[in-house]
């Protein structure tokens, strides 16, 4: 199993320069890794065998293929027999009986779970992919030399002066586009989380409404109720009906009882994903409130920089940032998150010294 998910470890390795913040990483990196791990797990026959296994006397390879392609079904009146160990026996009607077509609930999603998880992983990765293109290696260019020159103070001071010249230049429009592109990717993150929620609800036929009660029963320790609810969404066994031609040319109906072993894992995977998607959506929403506060309150931006710069004197910081736009502040914060607080304070102190030599224009004492 480790060999199957080992390639994901390289995807999650921390880079020396972080172009995403923590919540962005959770959405577009960790979530993608989780979805791909679930995909590999569900598609591995080594651990769960064939995705459908039907009981019969002969031609079982054909029966398995037929029931996999055309789908199995359960009765609307699913009976669940609780066992002593908290497990359950699913009996989608007696095998000898025929379930009327109007009472059949076909499990149409079963063949598509792996593909849907794979598609979701690509969709969740899209904002990170777009930002990586739009970012264009700017932060790496600004910060990477500090990681390479950690033991060389002279080169570090030289690069600090390069950064001071960079932030003293007029890149306001460039930095504003940089900020807008990042916020667009954050909006995309939130939109994807909400649309994914709706997609799974449609895919499983009212999944979230039923599974919320299942998770509550699990939290309360009511495993019988958990089994009853999850059996309706992820039945472990189902019936499959097939027509075969007889010797005289007439068709005979054969029905089989089939096991759906992947649903043992599906019920647990989607219980976890249900909680995970809610958590990620809530964090992204909180991040939007934070982003809005930084746009509306210049004093908050100043205090955030002070906290990162080891509480540099406020007046010095105001002088250092008097010609900075909001986009400049955003790029400065991204730089501050990628270098040590000591180096970041030195950068702001040198900016203060550079700005002190320039005559202060009227009203330019705010970011």
Swiss-Prot record:
One of its GO terms (biological process) is spermatogenesis. Residues 43-110, 208-268 are extracellular. It is a multi-pass membrane protein. GO terms for molecular function: gap junction channel activity; gap junction hemi-channel activity. One of its GO terms (cellular component) is membrane. Its main location: membrane. The chain crosses the membrane at residues 22-42, 111-131, 187-207, 269-289. It is found in: Cell membrane; Cell junction, Gap junction. Expressed in nurse cells and oocyte during oogenesis. Uniform expression in imaginal wing disk and low expression in developing imaginal CNS. Expressed in embryonic pole cells and primordial germ cells. Residues 1-21, 132-186, 290-367 are cytoplasmic. Keywords: Cell junction, Cell membrane, Gap junction, Ion channel, Ion transport, Membrane, Transmembrane, Transmembrane helix, Transport. Structural component of the gap junctions in germline cells. Required for differentiation and survival of germline cysts in females and of spermatogonia in males; gap junctional communication between spermatogonia and somatic cyst cells may be required for normal differentiation and survival of spermatogonia. This is Innexin inx4. It comes from Drosophila melanogaster. The lineage of its organism: Eukaryota, Metazoa, Ecdysozoa, Arthropoda, Hexapoda.
């Amino acid at each position: 199993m480790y060999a199957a998910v080992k390639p994901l470890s390289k995807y999650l390795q921390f880079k020396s320069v972080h172009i995403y913040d923590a919540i962005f990483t959770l959405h577009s990196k960790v979530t993608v890794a989780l979805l791909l791990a679930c995909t590999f797990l569900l598609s591995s026959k080594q651990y769960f065998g064939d995705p459908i296994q039907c009981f019969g006397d002969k031609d079982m390879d054909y029966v398995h293929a037929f029931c996999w392609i055309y789908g199995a079904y359960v009765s609307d009146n699913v009976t669940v027999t609780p066992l002593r160990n908290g497990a359950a026996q699913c009996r989608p009607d007696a095998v000898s009986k025929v379930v009327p077509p109007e009472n059949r609930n076909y499990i149409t999603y079963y063949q598509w779970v792996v593909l849907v998880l794979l598609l979701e992983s690509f969709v969740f990765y899209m904002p990170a992919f777009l930002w990586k293109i739009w970012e264009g290696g700017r932060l790496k260019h600004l910060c990477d030399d500090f990681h390479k020159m950690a033991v060389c103070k002279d080169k570090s001071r030289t690069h600090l002066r390069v950064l001071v010249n960079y932030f003293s230049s007029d890149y306001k429009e460039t930095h504003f586009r940089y900020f807008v592109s990042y916020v667009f990717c954050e909006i995309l993150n939130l939109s994807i989380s909400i649309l994914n929620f709706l997609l799974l609800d449609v895919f499983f036929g009212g999944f979230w409404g039923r599974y919320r009660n299942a998770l509550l029963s699990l939290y309360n320790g009511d495993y019988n109720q958990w089994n009853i609810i999850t059996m309706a969404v992820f039945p472990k066994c189902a019936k499959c009906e097939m027509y075969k031609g007889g010797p005289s040319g007439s068709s005979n109906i054969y029905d089989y009882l089939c096991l759906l072993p992947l649903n043992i894992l599906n019920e647990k995977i989607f219980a976890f994903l249900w909680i995970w998607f809610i958590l990620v959506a809530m964090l992204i929403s909180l991040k939007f409130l934070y982003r809005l506060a930084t746009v509306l309150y210049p004093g908050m931006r100043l205090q955030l920089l002070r906290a990162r710069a080891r509480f540099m004197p406020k007046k010095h910081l105001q002088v250092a940032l008097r010609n900075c736009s909001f986009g400049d502040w955003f790029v400065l914060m991204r730089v501050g998150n990628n270098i040590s607080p000591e180096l970041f304070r030195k950068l702001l102190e040198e900016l203060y010294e550079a700005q002190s030599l320039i005559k202060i224009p009227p009203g330019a004492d705010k970011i």
